């Protein structure tokens, strides 16, 4: 089914309706040809006349092996799909009055997620009257983002969505996140002058 849909994207040979076409590619003089002459050229080479730009004036065609062309096109699409990295979003939930132990535990998990290349969506859930502490929740999320500044960049600042206040973070590039500050080298004097004791001076 997929090959059929790909085939329908291009007109070939007698399916081409234009009276003249511009041929491009190798082993042929690139110029405008009457359709009958273009078809004859393709037939002589035992190849296909493929319309690759139907909206051009006149339409642009290539003389190629159509089956091979479709195979290369499918292969290229498959390679592009493989290059697309799927990004996971990990959620971390806080309460408006999260204690330090719980906070540090979740902060450690967030660092791990970001180092693995995942995005982090952290939120404070307000239950019942705890919505009165929404400012406290915002402070908590901003602290969370600040503590992760070496690992993440902020995609979305804290925003209230119903009973949730959410912040979204995405990982920084690994070289930025893992870069360690340069350790200063111990100072080594270029030349150390030995001092003689005062009593050893020659008179």
Swiss-Prot record:
Q: Report the GO molecular function annotations.
A: ribosome binding; translation initiation factor activity
Tell where it localizes.
Cytoplasm
Any single GO CC term annotated in Swiss-Prot or TrEMBL for this entry: membrane
Q: Which UniProt keywords apply?
A: Cytoplasm, Initiation factor, Protein biosynthesis
Does Protein biosynthesis show up as a keyword for this record?
yes
* Any GO BP annotation: ribosome disassembly
Q: Where do the record's region annotations for Disordered lie?
A: 168-203
The UniProt entry, under PROSITE patterns, shows: IF3 (PS00938)
Instruction: Tell me which HAMAP family the record gives.
Output: IF_3
| NCBIfam families with a match to the protein in the record | infC
Q: What does this protein do?
A: IF-3 binds to the 30S ribosomal subunit and shifts the equilibrium between 70S ribosomes and their 50S and 30S subunits in favor of the free subunits, thus enhancing the availability of 30S subunits on which protein synthesis initiation begins.
Family indicated by similarity: Belongs to the IF-3 family.
Q: What is this protein called?
A: Translation initiation factor IF-3
What organism is recorded for this protein? Bacteroides fragilis (strain ATCC 25285 / DSM 2151 / CCUG 4856 / JCM 11019 / LMG 10263 / NCTC 9343 / Onslow / VPI 2553 / EN-2)
